[in-house]
Every structure is written in C-alpha cells, then in structure tokens.
Design a protein with these regions (language model features):
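Acidic, glycine-rich flexible loop segments
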Residues: 3, 70-102
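Immediate N-terminus of the mature polypeptide
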Residues: 65-67, 87, 112
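Short, glycine-/polar-rich solvent-exposed loops and beta-turns at beta-strand/coil boundaries
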Residues: 31-32, 68-70, 295-300
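Extracellular/periplasmic, surface-exposed regions of secreted and cell-surface proteins
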Residues: 41-50, 55-60, 94-150, 160-468
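Transmembrane beta-barrel wall of Gram-negative outer-membrane proteins
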Residues: 2-66, 117-120
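Low-complexity intrinsically disordered tracts that form flexible linkers/tails across taxa
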Residues: 61-77, 446-450
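Flexible, solvent-exposed loop segments that connect beta-strands
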Residues: 155-158
Length: 468
C-alpha cells in the first residue's frame, strides 16, 4: 500500500508519503516480513535571502523467521511422513532420525524488529550578493531487537532463549561558506569556499542467552531462565573533524585553476597524530576556445587537465586500536567462575598516523562532430606511504601482531573511454562505447628493512598482492 501527498505555495512546498508492505513466508505459516514507513519533505523560503528544508523518514520493520535453512524444507523427500495419526507434525521424517523441519519450526520462534529514523536539515543564507552560507545537518538512528526461543519440545534440547539489542546513532554537522569575489574585469572569476564539519558514528549492543526456562515462553520472559555465560556487550564510537579551504579561479572561462587544502582530525589515532593535512591543486585548459581552433567547426570540446593531490585514509585502523585492547577470560576461583581480563594479542601502537596517497593525474576530454564522437584519455600515478598494516611480532614478547605504518606502494595506469553515435536521427539513435584500462601495482617498500640485494625484505607472505 502506498499513499503520497504533495502541495504548497510559492514559498512553501510539502511532500508526504506512507507505505505499508506485508509479505508472508514461503514455507512456514507465521513467518514473513512487514514494513511500515513514513516520509516528510519540506522546503520553506522565509525571505529572498534565507530558506531551509527538511527531509525526514521513519521505517519500522518486523521479520518473523523460521528455524533452520531453507534447504531443509526444499530438499526433504516428498515421501517423508510429516504428520502422525493425529494430524500433528512428526518429530522425525524417516527411520534414520532426520528431524522434521516443520516440527522444529513449530517449537521455535524468532522475531527481528528494527526502527530507523533519518532527518536531514539544510539552511541557505544569502545576506548579500555573492555570499552564501549553507548549513547541512543529518541524524540517523536505528534501534533493533533480535529475539529467539526454543520451547521444551524442540529437538536436541529446548527451553532456551536469546535476546540481542542494539542501537546505532550517526550525525553530521557541516558548515559551508561560499563567496564569489566581485571583480570589475569580467574576464576573471574567483570563488572562495570554506567548509567545516563534524562527523560522529556510534553504536552499542547487548545480548543475553538463557536456558532452563520454567515454562514455554518466548524471549520476553528471558529473566526467568538461567543465564549461560556473561552478557555480551559491545560499544563503538568514532569522530572526524574536518576543515577545508578552496579557491577556484577562471580566466576567460578558458583557463581554470582549483587549489584546496583540508585538515582532518580523527579520534582513531593517538594524541600526537590525530590530525592530517592534505593539499590538492588542479588546472584545466579549454583548448578549443583558443583563437587558432575557434573556427574549427568539428571540434565541440577539447580540454586538457592536470591535477595533483594528497588524500588520507583512516579505514585501516579500529576505533580503539591506539589505546590498547583487553580480552575477557573466565577463570574458576572458589568453585565459581569469575571474569578476568588479559591484554590483547595485538600490541597497541599509539604512534599510528594517517595513511597518505599522493596522485598525479593527466587527462584529455574531447567531443567532436556535434557530440557524435566523445571520450576521455587519462593517465594517473599514485604513491602511497605509511600503509596501515599488521606487523608480525615474535610470540615470546607476549604479542603476535601490531598495527603499524609500514611501507610504500606505487600504482599507475591509463584509462581510455570512447563513445560514438553510429546512427543519429530524430527517431533513432545507435550509440557504441568502449573502455580500456591498463594498470600496474608495485610494492616499493614494506618496511625500512632491505635484503642483501637492496630489495624490500619479507612480509610479502602476510597477504600483500604484487601487481604485474
């Protein structure tokens, strides 16, 4: 089911919708999937110089799952005896002791529910000509509950229940300032941009398992059972703070220059290395606008471009790697199991820093014969240093691995794309396109150790891929 409403005035625009979806399971009665969602979008112009908008959505899902694998149902023999003389499910479907999947499903229950809420808000402020401030914010929340139980008749042992609950909360705040510098000579155009953002990602979960439920109840009565082991608890959080400044200059709309620098700070790194600075620059030349090509009618576009930039990577490191992790271990003391903690097998490294990749790019964009033939030729060369990889350690130290900034790699390649309209009429267009790529990856150095031949020493067996 789907309903949608739209309306508004010159200054206010509203769109709202609701959806409901219900799908029954294919095999077992009672299994299925349900989803209910709402959506609301609003654009409001308060005045000519200020406006804002909201995009929001909410979704609630419920999934009832059957026990076992789907193959257990479709691979059972069609001659299997699934009912007894009283019309109830048999426990076994043959004399070999194979359980009846329908019997198991009858004594098993699992329900997974999720609530998702997403809100995006923006505001544009233009107090004077050429100046624009934009605020972007977004919030995402998800809560989920995964509960299952096996009653006392479940084959192989029942009277158990499991409950896992989790919550995810992400939010982003972004401030963007753009200023088109007024220049009397219209041949010149200069635009300045500044960006500041804060990105937060967090999640937490907890889970319980019990046995010996006194009565055949579901996971909502989990407190009546005997806990098996300790509750499972997880917590993850990371923050990224960024600043960026950019200048875009154009001369005659023919010579284009873009210079930028950004500074990122990540909570994943140690105190001394949280921040990284990453500059970039790009230049483009519209050759077809030069006087010596302006009268060449078959050239629609011919642009040469070159760029160089450095980007940082933090994805190779966990949220708490630099702090040092501990593993929980149970031990028996006084005939009672206690929970203790031991250092992780991975040695912490507070000196980890951003992995950096520097890329030089040269390209040509072209379009000929009124757009009937167009394509791109591009060459790139990337050097990556301070790779975030695990270093093997001597087990006698009490640790087996340590994440470290090791080595350098180099990659280069050529990308070609060509598209053409073989046939172009008012009623019919036939377009052909082709792409070609050639690249090479090379390990320049894995660490600072060289062998007797002056080549990078060892650790290739750790999982590195060597390019041709």
């Amino acid at each position: 089911y789907k309903r949608q409403v739209r309306g508004g005035t010159e200054k206010i625009k509203v769109s709202a919708g609701a959806n409901y979806f219900d799908q029954q399971g294919m095999v077992v009665t009672g299994s299925g999937y349900q989803k209910f969602s709402l959506r609301l979008n609003l654009d409001f112009e308060i005045a000519k110089w200020i406006s804002f908008g909201i995009n929001s959505s909410y979704a609630m899902t419920k999934q009832d799952r059957e026990d076992g694998n789907f193959n257990d149902f479709i691979t059972s023999s069609p001659l299997a005896e699934i009912y007894d003389a009283d019309g109830k499910y048999t426990k076994y479907i043959n004399s070999e002791g194979n359980y009846n999947p329908l019997y198991r499903a009858e004594h098993y229950g699992r329900e997974v529910t999720r609530d998702n809420y997403r809100l995006n808000f923006f505001m544009d402020v233009k107090p004077f000509k050429g100046f624009n401030y934009r605020l972007n914010t977004s919030v995402y929340n998800q809560t989920s509950e995964d509960g299952s139980y096996k009653d006392s008749q479940y084959p192989g042992g029942g009277g158990t229940a499991v409950l896992d609950e989790s919550r995810t909360q992400n939010w982003l705040v972004e401030n963007i300032v753009t200023y088109k510098v007024p220049i009397r000579n219209k041949k010149h155009q200069l635009t300045l941009t500044g960006v500041q953002s804060v990105d937060h990602n967090g999640s937490k979960s907890i889970g319980y398992s019990v046995e010996n439920l006194p009565v055949d109840k579901d996971w909502n009565f989990i407190s009546q059972g005997e806990f098996t082991g300790k509750p499972r608890r997880q917590f993850n959080e990371n923050n990224l703070v960024s600043f960026m400044a950019r200048a875009q200059y154009s001369l005659l709309d023919r010579y284009l220059l873009n210079v930028a620098v950004r500074r990122d700070g990540s909570s994943r790194f140690g105190k001394e290395n949280k921040w990284g600075t990453f500059p970039s620059a790009a230049f483009a030349w519209r050759v077809n606008q030069e006087s010596f090509l302006r009268d060449v009618s078959w050239i629609d576009n011919l642009k040469l471009r070159v760029s160089y930039g450095i980007v940082g990577n933090q994805n190779g490191i966990g949220n708490y790697t630099t702090l040092g992790l501990a593993d929980n271990k149970e031990y028996e003391f006084g005939n009672v199991f206690q929970m203790g903690y031991l250092p992780s097998k991975e040695l912490s490294n507070p000196n980890l820093k951003w992995e950096q990749s520097a890329t030089a790019n040269f390209g040509v964009d072209f379009s000929f014969f009124n757009g009937r033939l167009n394509g791109t030729v591009e060459y790139y060369n990337t050097h990556t240093k301070d790779l975030l990889v695990k270093r093997s350690l001597n087990a006698s130290l009490g640790y087996t691995t340590m994440l470290d900034n090791l080595g350098k790699t180099k990659s280069s390649g050529i990308d070609l794309s060509l598209n053409g309209d073989v046939v172009r009429t008012k009623e019919f267009t036939w377009t052909l396109g082709t792409n070609f790529s050639m690249y090479k990856n090379e390990i320049v150095r894995i660490d600072d150790t060289l062998d007797e031949n002056g080549k990078p020493a060892s650790q290739v067996a750790q999982g590195w891929i060597i390019g041709e």
